[in-house]
Amino acid sequence: MKRIFTILAAAIICCAGIQAKVKAETKDKEIKLVQDWDKTFPKSEKVNHEKVTFKTQYGLTLAADLYIPKSAEGKLPAIAVSGPFGAIKEQCSGLYAQTMAERGFITIAFDPSFTGESSGEPRRTASPDINTEDFLAAVDYLSMRDDVDAGRIAIIGICGWGGIALNAATQDPRIKATAAITMYDMTRVNGNGYFDADDSEESRYSARKAWAEARTADLKKKTFTQAGGVVDPLPEDAPQFIKDYYAYYKTPRGYHKRSGNSTDGWRTTGCQAYANTRFL
């Protein structure tokens, strides 16, 4: 009997050690926030600004810019902002957030999981589930603030984040208003291509084959390849929407070194999860 207890005790200690190791290995990496103003837009004199972080239910830490009106009194309505898809909070989502704070809202612009200053490995990865949770976690954060009226929380999704915002709003009655700005449905874009140009069995198979080959290549090289950001140099015959992307992300107006759209884009397989999911 004594020997049995000894074996059980050893097993418990071993299991505890394994659990501690797993916990240490899966612990979210500590993120480092840039405290200097490095936005692509001027700082407003009408609002106070600070960097904040909050957790998602996937255990990731999101970095956000918090904007509060200097004239704030009592509990205020609040807005969470994100997008465009592949952009960061230092770009237009931050400008939207700051502008809405000037108009009396407490706002945050956040970096989605795996991008910008937020945590998550490998970098530049997208997921319809995780990205929807990003918005819900932002609502969690705002709803717990003492200066926020939790009954008046809204979200703004820009470009590809417009579809994600709508998906989040269908799941969370705490979201009282939703705005989708120049919306793309990223599930449809990844599945069918821009303007449904690849809406055929042959095109979809080619996409799946390319993703599979990219995964194999990454495994062999033991690194993740990037798909590339906005095309540079800009072809003369580029469609207007590509010219619009270039005019923002690749010029001083909107370029930022942490932005995938401004630099090397998503991982080659980083948006694969969107292809067989539909928001709308």
For the regions a language model picked out, list residue spans one by one.
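N-terminal cap/lid segment of alpha/beta-hydrolase-fold proteins
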Residues: 28-74
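Conserved alpha/beta-hydrolase
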Residues: 99-119
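Alpha/beta-hydrolase fold nucleophile elbow
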Residues: 147-159
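Alpha/beta-hydrolase active-site loop
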Residues: 125-146
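Conserved serine/cysteine hydrolase catalytic core
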Residues: 271-280
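Short beta-strand element of the alpha/beta-hydrolase
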Residues: 74-84
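The serine-hydrolase catalytic nucleophile loop
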Residues: 86-98, 112
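Alpha/beta-hydrolase-fold enzymes
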Residues: 166-251
